[in-house]
UniProtKB/Swiss-Prot annotation:
This is 3-methyl-2-oxobutanoate hydroxymethyltransferase. Binds 1 Mg(2+) ion per subunit. One of its GO terms (biological process) is pantothenate biosynthetic process. Its EC number is 2.1.2.11. Keywords: Cytoplasm, Magnesium, Metal-binding, Pantothenate biosynthesis, Transferase. It holds the Pfam family Pantoate_transf. It comes from Dechloromonas aromatica (strain RCB). It catalyses: 3-methyl-2-oxobutanoate + (6R)-5,10-methylene-5,6,7,8-tetrahydrofolate + H2O = 2-dehydropantoate + (6S)-5,6,7,8-tetrahydrofolate. It is an enzyme of class 2 (transferase). Its main location: cytoplasm. Its cofactor is Mg(2+). 3-methyl-2-oxobutanoate binds at residues 51-52, 90, 119. Homodecamer; pentamer of dimers.
Length: 272
């Protein structure tokens, strides 16, 4: 697929067709026009303007300082750089938790900047907010498992959903978000078997990061996948620059690995 790049921007319907056909969806985080153009040329299906920009672009220890204005700025830059990839924008900490009205207002800002969908963290507690947003024309991706905006509540960056009770809570969260109208779920740092169950039971697109190979697709943090800067990374990260002739080649290899199911491998996966 990397050799065939369409000129029309992908839509939710296009991603649904990939999902229904059993084709894995390849998503990268990206924050600027140059990398967006490179990823688009490699055939990426979706770009996430993640609040991870707080870590990899702004140099913060957490994602918490990122603002709506930050995400909107980078979303607009990404949109200008690519013609094909489906664009998802993160809702940063403090931009949606107060009320559904606050969430809609800030999501509308991100949609105006070029997002086709927004992503927010939280489970059943956020279902009323998701329902409010979807009913007013905002497509929503839920984010459950390890939710970095709740790092202080979680006590650090730890694998979630371990143990029967924790796994059931995560399943309940997934079903609540689906019922509220979320058409995509990002599953982060949970056991692969649990991610497979959630994917099967919800019937919506699931995008994994540290959640095993049975999700509908994978999201890769650009800087991690390209080893920028070199150093220790999370277990689920693969350095696609190893053996690559260029960053474009690394991007093509990463997308192909998601599509053919070779990434993530067992070495990138958490067990229950």
């Amino acid at each position: 697929m990397s050799a065939q790049v369409a000129t029309r921007r992908l839509t939710q319907a296009d991603l649904a067709k990939l999902y229904q056909a059993g084709e894995k969806i390849a998503q990268f985080t990206c924050y600027d026009a140059s990398f967006a153009r490179l990823l688009d040329g490699a055939g990426v299906d979706s770009i996430l303007i993640g609040d991870s920009l707080g870590n990899v672009i702004q140099g913060h220890d957490t994602t918490l300082p990122v603002t709506v204005a930050d995400i909107a700025y980078h979303t607009a830059a990404v949109k200008r750089g690519c013609d094909r990839a489906f664009i998802v924008a993160d809702m940063p900490f403090g931009s949606y938790q107060e009320s559904p009205e606050q969430a809609f207002r800030n999501a509308a800002t991100l949609m105006a900047a070029g997002a086709q969908m927004v992503k927010l963290e939280g489970g059943a507690d956020m279902a009323p907010t998701v329902r409010f947003m979807v009913s007013r024309g905002i497509p929503v991706c839920g984010h459950i498992g390890l939710t970095p905006q709740s790092v202080h509540v979680l006590g650090g960056y730890k694998v979630q959903g371990k143990g029967e009770a924790a796994a059931q809570r995560l399943k309940d969260d997934a079903m609540a978000l689906k019922a509220a109208g979320a058409t995509m779920l990002l599953l982060e740092a949970i056991p692969a078997t649990l991610a497979a169950e959630v994917t099967a039971m919800t019937g919506v697109i699931t995008i994994g990061i540290g959640a095993g190979k049975d999700c509908s697709g994978q999201v890769m943090v650009l800087h991690d996948a390209f080893d920028i800067p070199p150093g220790k990374k999370a277990k689920f990260v693969k350095n696609f620059m190893e053996g690559a002739s260029s960053i474009h080649d690394a991007a093509c290899r990463a997308i192909a690995a998601v599509k053919d199911g070779s990434y993530p491998g067992p070495e990138h996966t958490y067990s229950a």
